Amino acid sequence: MSNNWLERTTLLLGEDKLQLLQRANVLVVGLGGVGAYAAEMIARAGVGRMTIADADVVSESNINRQLIALHSTIGREKSELMAERLRDINPDIELTVVNRFIKDDETDALLDSDKFD
């Protein structure tokens, strides 16, 4: 895929910095009110690898504040919806989807599962 969609980022940061972003690997845990917006902006910045984690499903009460919450998405898994959205923004993104809640005692294992920037 062409990187034309990143031309404004390249103008702002330069080619070398864009390549750093494209090699970066980011972890986003929780895709609710803040996490989904963060994940989307990270993807739009050109980050090349991302792990997203959430086990929740969209409920009607999420619609007023969550990016992926729509009447048409009620009952669907937030992690899968976000994955679809991120791949639509950047088809080249390497995405790992963790469809479970991350408990305190699992944090270290998740952080050790990959090299995150």
Protein language model regions, located:
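N-terminal charged helix/coil linker that caps or initiates catalytic domains
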Residues: 1-26
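Electropositive phosphate-/nucleotide-binding environments in soluble metabolic enzymes
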Residues: 3, 11, 15, 32, ...
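A generic local structural motif
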Residues: 12-16, 39, 104-109
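Solvent-exposed alpha-helices and their adjacent loops that cap or buttress functional pockets
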Residues: 19-20, 43, 110-113
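Glycine-rich adenosine-cofactor-binding loop
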Residues: 22-43, 49-54
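Short amphipathic alpha-helical segments
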Residues: 39-41, 64-65, 111
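Glycine-rich phosphate-binding loop and adjoining beta1-alpha1-beta2 segment
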Residues: 47, 52-90
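A structured beta-alpha segment of the ubiquitous adenosine-cofactor-binding alpha/beta core
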Residues: 75-116
